[in-house]
Amino acid sequence: AAPLLLIISNSLKPLNELWEFPPRLIPRQPTFENYRNLASIMSGSLVPFAMYLANTVFVTAVGTGGHIILASMCAFPLAKKRFPGRQVIFNAIVIALMFSGTVTVISNYMVMAALGWIDSLLSIVVPAFSSTLGLYLMKQFMEQVIPDSLLEAARIDGASQWKIFWRIVMPNVKSGWLTLMLLSVQTLWNSGQSPYILSEEKKTLAYALNQIVSGGVARAGVGAAVMVIMMLVPITVFIISQSNIIEAMASSGMKE
């Protein structure tokens, strides 16, 4: 909590207090000047602040929703079905976790170019659907939380695979997809410039605010204000979801 409090404190400090040593947690003369300067800088931008924000909200909401749905649907057969090549597929997923996104930038660019998605928000949203971490996480949750006897009982009662997935599996792995939601929101909300986005009006809020942070020493306080703004959404989502995650973990602890 200390680094978070220090960032908030720095965003409320005038410039002459930012470089004091040792640093003070509570400003002597708290001010919102850094936030006013940030608003002034953004108002002078070629692209309105609302457009950066709208792009970020779209990318975060659609990317997170698609990621949760696709990861869960792919994890279900890997966790609860027995078919040839199942372990090979899972091993490939684990190996894919060893590589960073930088390794696949060139191949991803070639795919985006072939699909005509260069300079489109789809080039950020669609790759977010296929994160291997989400698939791995949901598979582990389903294996540990969902007993096979529960699924078998649902089949005996005449439930279809689709109904089993949406009515039984997803509610019982709520803690898993809420955790995945937190990770996805944090990643997408804070995603900076994409190599596939060229037009200024299609860039995200993180890119615009990072440009402000790079303005130099005179904007150090503004940089702290930027960090506070970028942390607001992930922290809010965490606070809202925390109790639900704990409740879901407690209520979904079923045994054979």
Regions found by a protein language model. Give the residues of each.
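A hydrophobic, multi-pass inner-membrane permease signature
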Residues: 1-256
